[in-house]
């Protein structure tokens, strides 16, 4: 304790000496050459901010919230390429059907029936994944120039307005592809992407459709695994999810059809890296597309940056029986960006970060463990806040004093609600 006290006194003395010396030039919020912002130097509204996992947007139209994405000069979004991943999931399901055409039609009626668990009808990623599956299987219908992503309810007769019957031809044989049922998995408290609701839904669907269900598709692995464990596994029905959660990847050996890795290892790195760069006052591409002083750099086949959207997107990879052993641990950091930053050049800074739902399987079991590994490598002292998945106030009420933080990483409950957070920073 004595050594620690002496060290603190020395730092204080040095700071006082530097302040007395003054400076030749004008002050600025961020400085070059390894210096960084401090909480006392910068107004909360000017501090680095990254939105992640849930892109600020209109939940009805999907239109990006450009005000939130351009909140200040150090604001960015980090997620994954939703459309690329969605199309990949759809193609993965289609290819599985084509490769297993001899056994996929369980009741031999010539109709490949599938059920679909939709995460959140107002979430861009959920919308994209629903569209991706319907596009690949030919079951999508046009609505205002886009594939309709609304739940079809029950559709045993193929007459639902939200979907149509598709067709797949394999070895000269035609199969009808029908979305037998789909619904948003929202629980009674309002939480979406709800695994328990999906588990209950597959019980209802299996009672109604029986052996007409040939494939189960889910917008994520949390819901997918709930349905797999509740029904699909015992009935040997291939189930497809999204996120490459460790339990889902392991379940591929037991009949889980496949999943999509959204490169959470790259996303988590980017989430904290853009903050680190802004705090250091260096080019935003440092340690991303350009090698940093520790040797960290990402190759352009694992991410894209869209300047007009101020958004970094990780690219997706299909995980199937052919390659699942390469993805068994979803919490391993991405090797090309695993080098420790020098604390002398990149001093510790404090970050406030929230997870919209502490019970979300992907965010809690994959994303946050990765963040916690990267925060050490990037010398960031991160305070993690877990929400209830239902209300923004459950999270915003715990951001009582933004002034004690150097930067913010925000994962909203609803994509429309960016203003709930920026209002706090504007005070």
PLM regions with names:
Residues 21-427:
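A residue-level marker of the well-folded mature domains of exported/periplasmic proteins
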Residues 4-24:
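Sec-dependent N-terminal signal peptides of Gram-positive bacterial secreted proteins and lipoproteins
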């Amino acid at each position: 304790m004595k050594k620690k006290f002496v060290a603190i006194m020395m730092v204080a003395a040095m700071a006082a000496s530097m302040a007395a010396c003054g400076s030749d030039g004008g002050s600025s919020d961020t400085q070059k050459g390894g210096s960084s912002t401090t909480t006392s130097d910068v107004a909360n509204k000017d501090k680095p901010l990254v939105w992640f996992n849930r892109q600020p947007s209109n939940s009805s139209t999907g239109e990006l919230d450009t005000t939130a994405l351009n909140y200040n000069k150090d604001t960015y979004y980090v997620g994954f390429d939703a459309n690329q991943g969605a199309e990949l999931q759809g193609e993965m399901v289609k290819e599985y059907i084509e490769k297993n055409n001899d056994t996929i039609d369980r009741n031999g009626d010539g109709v490949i029936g599938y059920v679909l668990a939709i995460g959140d009808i107002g979430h861009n990623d959920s919308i994209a994944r629903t569209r991706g599956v319907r596009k690949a299987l030919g079951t999508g219908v046009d609505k205002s120039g886009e594939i309709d992503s609304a739940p079809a309810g029950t559709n045993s007769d193929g007459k639902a307005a939200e979907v149509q019957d598709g067709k797949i031809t394999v070895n000269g044989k035609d199969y009808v592809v029908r979305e037998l049922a789909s619904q948003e998995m929202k629980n009674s408290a309002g939480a979406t992407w709800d695994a328990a609701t999906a588990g209950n839904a597959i019980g209802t669907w299996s009672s109604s459709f029986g052996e007409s269900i040939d494939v189960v598709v889910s917008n994520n692995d949390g819901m997918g695994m709930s349905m797999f464990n509740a029904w699909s596994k015992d009935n040997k029905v291939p189930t497809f999810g999204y996120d490459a959660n460790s339990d889902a990847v392991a379940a591929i050996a037991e009949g889980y059809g496949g999943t999509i890795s959204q490169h959470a290892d790259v996303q988590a790195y980017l989430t904290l890296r853009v903050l680190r760069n802004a705090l250091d006052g260096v080019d935003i591409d440092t340690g991303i597309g350009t090698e940093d002083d520790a040797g960290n750099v990402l190759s352009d086949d694992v991410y894209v940056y869209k300047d007009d959207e101020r958004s970094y997107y990780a690219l997706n990879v299909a995980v199937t029986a052919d390659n699942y052993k390469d993805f068994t641990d979803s919490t391993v950091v991405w090797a090309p960006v695993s080098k420790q930053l020098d604390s002398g050049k990149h001093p510790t800074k404090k970050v406030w970060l929230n997870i919209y739902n502490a019970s979300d399987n992907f965010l809690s079991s994959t994303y946050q463990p990765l963040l916690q590994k990267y925060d050490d490598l990037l010398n960031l002292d991160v305070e993690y806040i877990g929400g209830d998945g239902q209300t923004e106030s459950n999270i915003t009420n715990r951001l009582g004093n933004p002034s004690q933080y150097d930067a913010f990483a925000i994962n909203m409950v609803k994509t429309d609600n960016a203003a709930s957070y920026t209002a706090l920073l504007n005070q």
